[in-house]
């Protein structure tokens, strides 16, 4: 600290010399002691400069020393403040020195990595350099996020996919893992996300769509449990948000896996569908479109949630020429997933099916509860727009637009 004080004093003397040289006066060098106090410096230094000429009023040296003393006096007043600044700088430097230093190599690696990431273009999910969605992400939805209406998602155009959906689905099943077993409806939804005729969407929007698809499946299972409880005259129980999140993440991980596989094989699945059909020995005629039409008439909720891998008979409604609905049977495969039963029900954050706002328009129309052997559903107080809410049981009606 004392060394810095001397340095500042020397700088002030040099500055005073330059000012004196500019004004035509020469600064004389005096050997004096260092004065620590501001007042002492302001009083003592001018007196020392004028000590030799007090009794000589007409001496030329008196005028010279008077000018010099004023300069020294101004500089002396600045010395204590400059000393405080130097001391503050030393304390800051000492504090910085005590902080742990980051390895220079790590800093360079992080800087180079950030620079490379900045130079890379932001690719959409439909670009050739496909970047899938990570399967490590979890979706912890709150109670308020569950107790909301499902937003309608973009519905694929049936006339565009009917001719080739069966061949695309068969090829997609071949490239998927054995435990996935995607349905035609799921294949059509993924095709819709990667369709180049639409405006390309980012991976973030695709992830939001997959979340909505998974949420639809969970709410479908929730309504099914409510319906089974009503038929058996059991007390309606609430499902915790944690249980809903558990099933939601199972469905979401399944959708993400199918999404990543479809994106990697997009060029061979949907860019040249006719070539895929010929390579598999199939056709792209009206028979494929008929198969898709039959599948789309089956509600999404017809899939079972049991662990058994057997087949079940599901019912679908068909409109005849006389206006009366006709019941027919279609064989469908079951999905393998964690059992979503009442045994995993708790009382924290209850979610009741009566709060679910469902409509017969859009994807949510296929969420009506299903039970094999009966084509009526229990609506209770649910807002289901399928013919009114006055009656306790309303027959299920398929939507006018095919649902994927």
Curated annotation (Swiss-Prot):
Q: What is its main location?
A: secreted
Q: Where in the cell is it found?
A: Secreted; Host cell
> What domain of life does the UniProt record list for this protein's source?
Eukaryota
Name of the encoding gene: RXLR12
Extent of the signal sequence: 1-21
Family classification: Belongs to the RxLR effector family.
Motif placement: RxLR-dEER: 48-65
Species of origin reads Plasmopara viticola
The alphabetized UniProt keywords are: Secreted, Signal, Virulence
Quoted from the entry, the domain comment is: The RxLR-dEER motif acts to carry the protein into the host cell cytoplasm through binding to cell surface phosphatidylinositol-3-phosphate.
The question of whether Magnesium is a record keyword is answered with no
Q: What functional role does this protein have?
A: Secreted effector that completely suppresses the host cell death induced by cell death-inducing proteins.
Single GO cellular component term = host cell
UniProt protein name = Secreted RxLR effector protein 12
């Amino acid at each position: 600290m004392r060394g810095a004080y001397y340095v500042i004093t020397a700088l002030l003397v040099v500055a005073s010399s330059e000012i004196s040289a500019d004004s035509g006066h020469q600064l004389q060098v005096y050997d004096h002691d260092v004065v620590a106090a501001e007042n002492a410096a302001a009083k003592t230094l001018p007196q020392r400069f004028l000590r030799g000429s007090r009794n000589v009023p007409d001496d030329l040296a008196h005028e010279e020393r008077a000018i010099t003393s004023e300069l020294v006096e101004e500089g002396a007043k600045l010395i204590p403040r400059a000393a405080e600044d130097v001391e503050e700088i030393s304390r800051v430097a000492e504090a910085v020195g005590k902080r742990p230093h980051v390895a220079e190599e790590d800093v360079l690696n992080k800087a180079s990595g950030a620079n490379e990431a900045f130079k890379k273009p932001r690719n959409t999910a439909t670009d050739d350099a496909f970047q899938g969605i990570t399967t490590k992400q979890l979706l912890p939805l709150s109670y308020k996020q569950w107790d909301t209406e499902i937003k309608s998602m973009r519905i694929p155009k049936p006339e565009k996919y009917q001719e080739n959906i069966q061949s695309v689905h068969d090829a997609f099943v071949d490239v998927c893992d054995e435990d996935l077993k995607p349905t035609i409806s799921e294949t059509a939804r993924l095709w819709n996300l990667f369709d180049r005729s639409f405006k390309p969407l980012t991976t973030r929007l695709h992830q939001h769509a997959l979340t909505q698809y998974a949420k639809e499946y969970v709410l479908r299972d929730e309504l099914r449990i409510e319906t089974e409880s009503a038929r058996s005259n059991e007390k309606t129980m609430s499902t915790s948000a944690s249980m809903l999140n558990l099933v939601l993440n199972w469905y979401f991980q399944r959708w993400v896996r199918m999404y990543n596989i479809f994106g990697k094989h997009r060029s061979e699945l949907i860019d040249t569908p006719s070539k895929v059909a010929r390579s598999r020995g199939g056709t792209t005629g009206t028979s494929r479109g008929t198969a898709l039409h039959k599948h789309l008439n089956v509600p999404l909720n017809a899939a079972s949630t049991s662990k058994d891998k057997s087949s079940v008979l599901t019912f679908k409604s068909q409109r005849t020429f006389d206006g009366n609905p006709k019941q027919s049977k279609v064989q469908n495969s079951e999905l393998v997933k964690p059992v979503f039963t009442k045994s995993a029900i708790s009382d924290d954050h209850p979610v009741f099916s009566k709060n679910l706002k469902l409509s017969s328009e859009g994807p949510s129309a296929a969420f009506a509860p299903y039970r094999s052997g009966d084509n009526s559903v229990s609506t209770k107080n649910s807002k289901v727009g399928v013919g009114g809410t006055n009656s306790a049981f309303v027959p299920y009606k398929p939507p006018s637009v095919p649902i994927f």
